[in-house]
């Protein structure tokens, strides 16, 4: 394998590359199999299908070892109605996978598409509309073939595959690879754009160490594609990282990335450059979690809520986050402090977990009122509080807590006593949930 000219980091990064790069045999198998699939689709498809394109990392030699995912997009004429697009896409997808004796099923995004398994290969056959750069999309996936065309054109005479693989593996090691709403990290497309912008993995992270939230990136190719001047004013986005999409300048490719994961990327880029190690590339986030959990725990509590059937992760995770933040506000109002909280969903159950500093508070709390010289405020305070007194310069009172035990508070949450206070998303309802004490469910 070709050595990377990266000085002191050379040995470590090439060791990682030897672990994660597909062999020439693997690449050939992917190419031969993909060609068979495309040939069969061409054989059975007709108008309004106007083009068949393989997209994704395996189409661009940007995949990791043992990644056998093949993404095929069927581009339909713009005038095609959605029902025809949906029905034709599903029919073609199922027929192709059946022809190769594979197993197929329907997945759902904005519209349904066919996924399948044929031998060791995972296949998605996705219908979309044929559009041009910066044209208004008709369905959410219409840009994907344009992304593929842009990257292939931009990669000419550039050898970036190894650097893309290193970045993906680095982000996987940190637990921040993936643009799904559960992960809120970096998409594969974003990784490829970053490597294209900076020309290599090490060059990228050397710059990343200086980043701050609100960082904005415009690829040089964008100015050439659209004949823009260097002082062109681009659309504004309120996101931690902004990377303008070359095929749609009104879209931020990094929109799914949250601030914490951006800051992890910044911090661990600094750490890797200071103390280079293979450890960063292999389950580093799990090692950090395990290390931090080797301590005396606070009071652990988990709500287990039945997960509705057929609700995808990109729906269920935002709803878990929404209700957990609403509960967080309630517990803070009752003076309970938590060290951390987390949510996770498996096939059947949603888990909302907390680690509290204490589970029991004193029966009495100090309520601090306005300064004694604030006449209207003082009179209002003493009207609503018995046994008032002056502490420092404020009028104060002792109040009996309504909830001194966190378990009792959560029992009332589960019994529906806060229905008018807590935000109830459509699919994650805390009523009739099971309370598990001494348990904190980590994300996997």
Curated annotation (Swiss-Prot):
Chain coiled-coil ranges: none
- InterPro entries annotated for this entry? CAA_C, CCA-adding_arc, CCA_tRNA_nucleotrans_2, NT_2-5OAS_ClassI-CCAase, NT_sf, NuclTrfase_I-like_C, Polymerase_NTP_transf_dom, tRNA_NucTransf2
Residues the record lists as binding CTP = 57, 60, 147, 168, 177
> GO biological process: any one?
RNA repair
Question: From what superkingdom does this record's organism come?
Answer: Archaea
Q: Which reaction does it catalyse?
A: a tRNA precursor + 2 CTP + ATP = a tRNA with a 3' CCA end + 3 diphosphate; a tRNA with a 3' CCA end + 2 CTP + ATP = a tRNA with a 3' CCACCA end + 3 diphosphate
Q: What else is known?
A: A single active site specifically recognizes both ATP and CTP and is responsible for their addition.
The name on file for this protein is CCA-adding enzyme
What is the organism field in this record?
Methanococcus maripaludis (strain C7 / ATCC BAA-1331)
Gene that encodes it? cca
């Amino acid at each position: 394998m070709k050595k990377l000219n990266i000085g002191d980091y050379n040995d470590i990064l090439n060791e990682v590359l030897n672990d994660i790069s597909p062999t020439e045999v693997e690449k050939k198998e992917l190419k031969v199999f993909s060609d068979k699939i495309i040939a069969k689709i061409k054989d059975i498809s007709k108008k309004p299908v106007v083009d068949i394109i393989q997209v994704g990392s395996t189409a661009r030699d940007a995949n990791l070892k043992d990644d056998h995912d093949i993404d095929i997009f069927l581009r339909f004429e713009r005038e095609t109605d959605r029902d025809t697009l949906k029905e034709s896409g599903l029919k073609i997808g199922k027929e192709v996978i059946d022809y190769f004796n594979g197993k197929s099923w329907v997945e759902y995004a904005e519209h349904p598409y066919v996924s399948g398994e044929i031998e060791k290969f995972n296949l998605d056959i996705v219908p979309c509309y044929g559009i041009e750069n910066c044209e208004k999309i008709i369905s959410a996936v219409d840009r994907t073939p344009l992304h593929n065309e842009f990257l292939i054109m931009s990669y000419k005479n550039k050898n970036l595959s190894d650097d893309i693989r290193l970045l993906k593996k680095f982000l996987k090691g940190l637990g921040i690879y993936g643009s799904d709403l559960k992960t809120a990290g970096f998409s594969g497309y974003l990784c490829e754009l970053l490597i294209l912008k900076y020309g290599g993995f090490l060059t990228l992270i050397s710059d990343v160490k200086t980043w701050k939230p609100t960082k904005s990136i415009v690829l040089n190719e964008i100015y050439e594609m659209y004949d823009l001047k260097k002082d062109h004013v681009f659309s504004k986005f309120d996101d931690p990282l902004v990377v303008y999409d070359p095929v749609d300048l009104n879209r931020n490719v990094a929109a799914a990335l949250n601030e914490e994961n951006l800051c992890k990327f910044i911090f661990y880029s600094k750490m890797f450059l200071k103390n280079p190690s293979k450890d960063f590339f292999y389950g580093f986030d799990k090692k950090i979690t395990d290390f931090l959990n080797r301590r005396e725990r606070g009071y652990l509590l988990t709500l287990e809520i039945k997960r509705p059937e057929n609700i995808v992760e990109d729906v269920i995770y935002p709803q878990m986050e929404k209700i957990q933040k609403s509960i967080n506000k309630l517990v803070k109002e009752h003076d309970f402090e938590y060290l951390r909280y987390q949510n996770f969903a498996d096939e059947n159950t949603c888990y909302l977990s907390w680690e509290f500093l204490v589970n029991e508070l004193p029966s009495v709390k100090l309520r601090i009122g306005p300064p004694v010289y604030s006449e209207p405020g003082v009179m209002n305070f003493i009207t609503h509080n018995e046994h008032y007194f002056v502490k420092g310069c404020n009028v104060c009172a002792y109040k009996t807590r309504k909830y001194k035990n966190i378990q009792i508070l959560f029992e009332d949450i589960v019994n529906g006593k806060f229905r008018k206070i807590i935000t109830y998303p459509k699919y994650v309802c805390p009523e009739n949930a099971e309370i598990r004490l001494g348990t904190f469910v980590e994300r996997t």
